[in-house]
Structures are given as C-alpha cells and as structure tokens.
C-alpha cells in the first residue's frame, strides 16, 4: 500500500473520533442546559422558597395562659418568665459537637441533652427543640454573651406556669405539662416542642379557655439564627381567659393544717349554693414540679408512694361510707313504713339473722339498750339499723341511696370522678350470677359490704339532707352558669327527723361527736368508721399485723351548720385513722 493512502485512512479515523467526541460533548452540554432550565425555570420558585427558608424564620409568640384566682382574688396559678435553652437542627452544622460544647460550658449532662433531641425526631428541622426549659439566669447570660460559639443554640424567654401556693389545692388546681406524645396527630404548622396544656384539675378542665391564641412574626435571621429584621406586621398573641374559683385558699390552708400529715380528704361547701369552698386530698404534691416537664426522679417518687399523692381522693377515692350511710337507711325505713319516730329497738350488742350462725355486732360492747330513731342516730347504733335495713330490703336501700346522689357521679366536671357502687339484687345477679341473700343486707344498712362512695358524694348527700331535699350541683367556678338545682322527692318531715338526730350527735350526751360541738352556733354531724378488711380476715392476722396501720379502719366525720339554716358543710376522711369521732371529727 502506498504511503499517501495510509495517511488518508489515518486522517479518516481521527475525523470519525472527533465527530464522536463532539457529539458526546454536545450531548453533555444539552443535558446540562436541560437540567439548568428545569432547576431555574420549571423548579425555580420552589428553590427560591427553599433559599428564603434558610434566612426567614417564623418566630412564635406563645400566648400567656389564663390566671387562676380563688374567690377573693388570690392568685393560685400564674405565669413567670423562664429562660429556655433552644436548639434548631437546621442551623446546627455539627449537632453532636454543638451538644458537647453546650454540655461542657453550661455543666449540663450530655446524655440528657441528646435524649431531648431524640425525643423530638418527628419535629421539623426548622422548629426549635427545648433542651432546658428553665435555665438558671447566670447560665442564660453566659450563652447569650458567647452565642457565636454555639451555632443553632439560643436563649428564648418563655412564660412558665407558676403556682405560688405550692402544694395547697394541688389536686383541684391541677398542673400543666409539655405535649410531646401527640405531635404526630397535629398538623405540621401546629407542632411545637414547647406546647403547654393542662394535664389535670382545673388546668385540664378549662384548658381550651385558658390556652389563648399564639401570635408570631416573620424575621430575617443570619447564619447563626439571630434576628436581623422583622418582616411584615407581627401577629400579637391573645392571652387566655382568667378563671375565678369558688375556692377560698384560707379555708384550704386550714383544712391542710388540720389533717396534720394524715392521708385522706377534706371538703368544705355551701349547701345552699353548691359552692366548693375547699377541696383537699392528702398526701399532696407540688404542681410546680410539672411546669417544665417533671424529671424521672420526682416522677418515680410520686408513683412509688403507696398513699397515691397524684390521686384526688375527694372524687377518685372509693370508700365504704360506714355509719354516715345510716341516714339513708333511716330515710328508707321511714318512707317504707318500717319504722316511725317512736319505733324502739333493744340493742344488746348483737343481731342475729336466720341462716347465719355468727351475729352481727354493734360497735358498742354490751349494746345501747332501748333506743328510738333519734337515739340510734345519736349513738350510731348498728343493731337499730340492722333491723331497719333488713325490714326495707336492699332494693329500697338502693332506691333511696340513689335519690341522695349515691352510686353516680356528682357531675362536678373534674376528670376521672368515680361513681361508686350501691348494690341491688339485680346488680348482684348481673355481676355474680347469684341472688341477693338476706344475710348481706345488715352490712349494707350500715354502709359496709359492697357499698363504695367518694367523699364528694357523701358531702353531696349531706347537703341534700341539710337543704330540705334541694340538690345544688357542686360548683367550682365563681358566678358559674348553667347549673340546674333539683328538688329531690324527699319528705321534709323525714329529713327533719334525721337532722334532729344529727344535731344530737354533736350536742347531746351520748352523741358520738359530743367533743366537737361549737359555741358559736348549733352544728349537726355524723361520725363513721368504715372497715378496710372483713372481721373474718382480721381474725386470721396476728397481733402485730392487726396493729399495722394499713389494717386500721377509715375515719369519717361530716357536719353542717348552723343546723337550722345551714351555710356551710364540712367533710373529713382520715384513711386508716381508726374511729371517726377520734380521728376525723377533730379535723372539722
């Protein structure tokens, strides 16, 4: 082959390669141009918004929660400034390093800070995470001074719930806490790690009114997350509504001091209006522990307490009412014609019933002798009411107990109020598939056996009795609207007889609460001692176990006065306090 021919062939191969290479280059540039067109034109608005999102921040202005007052304007729950240590992940290039710096500089446990981050994994990257809810002032000022060293971390002053009376009325007032577990159920724009809601008591019941409306502003921020300028017109937050209670914190304090550290409940009401003037449950707790999220140590301590400090025993505690229930049995006996005011029974200390070998005993060894209705109420004679209860039967007892408001919630509005239990023959057949036995009625007649009530139900019953059968619904709020008083179909003459017996309890010789009579006005009252275990079980215990406090009876006392025109009613329950006249009556 000639040399010229070889040169032409080589040039052709080079030319082909250049054409291919040029095509590839053109293809690449075409793809790049197409992508640039897509990014700048088709998706331009989207990425412009992304870019602006890196420098424009929506800064929330939390609404101030409504203040809770007592009936005299004393503040029970308010707001105070708290220095929140917040972190925005979007503004934190090296999260772990920043957390380490914060931990070291402010002497905060790294593990706890990291746990806060993990717990907020569902929160949007641009939303703040609260690392510390209420940082000490000195630490807050240090971080403010050296903020450049902590990218994405800032100090934000936020309102924090504060309870100036600490433990006083804690169960009634309730407490607030941070919402975290319900984030996924909220729209993205409403998710916030600082959302505060009521968790119990009035704080929960009135949460929708007290929470207010958050405001906010759009602000331009620098690369450190610091505000440069406000964009547009800020939206002001709207404070929540204030709440005024019927509670008198002075009475609440007196009730707390009177209990002297015992476990139980105290309630003070106005029977004419239904106003709750005091409601105390013991042991109590400090609601301030929950304002910024309770720590694990305090939470475990509250849960481990065998006396259940988080339970509002006034509405959630279920107890046999004991001898206070005798007012129901007395009314049932009068209404059913089983007894009259003059009916007398002989109490020799025990009562036999057919088919049962062991007698039902009276609390007074040797008995009360011959007693009529007034005497039986005054001395709390079990035998008199055993007879009366068996005479009317369990279903009549059930009927009149319901009329007095037992066996159903009072409707006070507080969460988890218990209804208690007033048994009937139908109830036992439904639950146990057994008939009601006559031998079960004596226990029911004196408020034992299956019967359980809450302290609020018991004082509600006494208010109906004191108020001539007019039921005033329990009222928590000052000037509360929508309450519907109800005249219960009870005969005045029977109610008057029972009130006479209750006056004798406090003011006559032989009365079970003679030691607590008042000089200022005449008081009507009733003591009660309710068993926590049966006599049969008690007999199986040794002396040391019998002496244990957990096996001691509960002590009740309820009173109203002045007896002829009641303006106040008081109930005291002392758990495992022993006799009502010894433990509960002195509280009142």
Q: Positions of the model-derived regions?
A:
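Beta-lactam-recognizing serine transpeptidase/beta-lactamase-like catalytic domain environment
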Residues: 2-8, 77, 221-232, 272-323, ...
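Periplasmic/cell-envelope proteins involved in peptidoglycan metabolism and beta-lactam response
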Residues: 1-296, 318, 338-340, 346, ...
């Amino acid at each position: 082959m000639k040399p010229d021919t070889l040169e032409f062939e080589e040039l052709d191969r080079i030319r082909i390669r250049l054409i291919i290479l040029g095509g590839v280059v053109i293809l690449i540039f075409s793809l790049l141009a197409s992508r640039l067109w897509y990014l700048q034109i088709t998706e331009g608005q989207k990425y412009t918004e992304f870019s602006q999102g890196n420098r424009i921040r929506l800064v929330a202005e939390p609404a101030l929660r409504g203040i809770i007052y007592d009936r005299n304007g004393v503040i029970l729950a308010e707001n105070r400034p708290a220095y929140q240590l917040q972190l925005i992940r979007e503004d934190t290039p090296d999260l772990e390093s920043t957390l380490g710096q914060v931990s070291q500089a402010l002497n905060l446990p790294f593990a706890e800070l990291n746990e806060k981050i993990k717990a907020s994994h569902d929160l949007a990257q641009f939303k703040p995470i609260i690392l510390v809810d209420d940082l000490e002032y000195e630490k807050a000022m240090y971080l403010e001074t050296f903020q450049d060293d902590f990218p994405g971390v800032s100090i934000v002053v936020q309102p924090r719930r504060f309870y100036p009376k600490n433990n006083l009325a804690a169960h009634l007032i309730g407490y607030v806490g941070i919402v975290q577990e319900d984030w996924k159920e909220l729209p993205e724009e409403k998710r916030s790690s600082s959302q505060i809601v009521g968790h119990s008591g009035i704080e929960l019941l009135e949460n929708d009114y007290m929470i207010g409306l958050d405001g906010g502003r759009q602000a331009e921020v620098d690369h450190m997350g610091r505000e440069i300028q406000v964009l547009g017109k800020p939206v002001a937050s709207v404070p929540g509504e204030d709440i005024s209670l019927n509670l008198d914190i002075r009475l609440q304090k007196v009730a707390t001091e009177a209990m002297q550290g015992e476990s139980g409940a105290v309630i003070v009401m106005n029977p004419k209006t239904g106003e709750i003037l005091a409601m105390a449950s013991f042991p109590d707790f400090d609601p301030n522990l929950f304002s910024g999220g309770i720590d694990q140590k305090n939470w475990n301590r509250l849960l481990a307490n065998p006396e259940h400090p988080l339970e509002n025993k006034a509405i959630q505690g279920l107890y046999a009412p004991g001898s206070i229930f005798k007012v129901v049995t007395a009314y049932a006996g009068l209404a059913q014609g089983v007894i009259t005011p003059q009916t007398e029974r002989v109490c020799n200390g025990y009562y036999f019933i057919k088919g049962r070998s062991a007698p039902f005993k009276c609390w007074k060894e040797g008995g009360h002798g011959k007693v009529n209705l007034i005497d039986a109420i005054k001395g709390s004679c079990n035998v008199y009411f055993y007879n009366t209860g068996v005479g009317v039967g369990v279903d009549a007892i059930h009927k009149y107990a319901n009329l007095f408001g037992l066996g159903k919630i009072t409707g006070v509005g507080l969460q988890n109020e218990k209804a208690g239990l007033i048994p009937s023959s139908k109830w036992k057949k439904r639950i146990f598939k057994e008939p009601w036995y006559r031998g079960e009625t004596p226990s029911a007649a004196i408020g034992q056996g299956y019967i359980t009530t809450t302290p609020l139900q018991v004082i509600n019953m006494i208010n109906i009795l004191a108020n001539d059968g007019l039921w005033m619904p329990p009222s928590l709020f000052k000037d509360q609207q929508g309450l519907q008083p109800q005249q219960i179909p009870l005969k005045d003459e029977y109610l008057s007889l029972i009130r006479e017996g209750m006056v004798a309890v406090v003011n006559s010789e032989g009365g079970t609460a003679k030691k607590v009579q008042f000089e200022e006005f005449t008081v009507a009252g009733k003591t009660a001692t309710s068993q926590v275990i049966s006599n049969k079980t008690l007999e199986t215990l040794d002396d040391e176990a019998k002496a244990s406090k957990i096996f001691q009876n509960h002590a009740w006392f309820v009173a109203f006065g002045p007896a002829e025109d009641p303006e106040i009613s008081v109930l005291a329950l002392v758990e495992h306090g022993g006799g009502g006249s010894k433990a509960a009556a002195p509280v009142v």
